[in-house]
Amino acid sequence: MQRTPALQITSTGSFQGPDRFSYWADVVTQTFVPLQCDTPDRGSFCDDLRHRQIGLVGITDVQTSPLRAARTPATIARAPRDDLIVVLQIGGTCHTSQNASAARLLPGDGAIVTTDECNFFEFSGDFR
C-alpha cells in the first residue's frame, strides 16, 4: 500500500500583532521561494495555508488577507530556482506581472509564472 504524503497546515491564528505577518512570510519562503512580502495591516493579517508535496510537485491552497509579494533580483540571488508556479484564482482579485506581461485574475482565472525571473502579485482584498 502506498502512503499518502502528509498535509502541512499552517495558520497565523495563534500569533498576535505584527508577528502574524512575519511568521507567514517565513512559511511562504519555505513552501515556495523567497519573496519580498508586504501587507497594508500587519496587525490583523490572517492566513491559512495547506500544502502537500507529491514528488517534485507541490500543491498549495492559500487563503489570506490583502498582500503584495514579489520575486526580486535579491530574492532570486538568495535562492535561485527554475520552477513554475501555477496560480488558480478561486476567490478575490489578483494583479500579477512578469516581464512585459500583466494580468488581472478573477475567480476562475489562472496564470503561470517562473521563479527564475522577477514577478509581482498584488491581492487588494481577501483571496484564495
Residues covered by each model-derived region:
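N-terminal functional module of multi-domain proteins
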Residues: 2-127
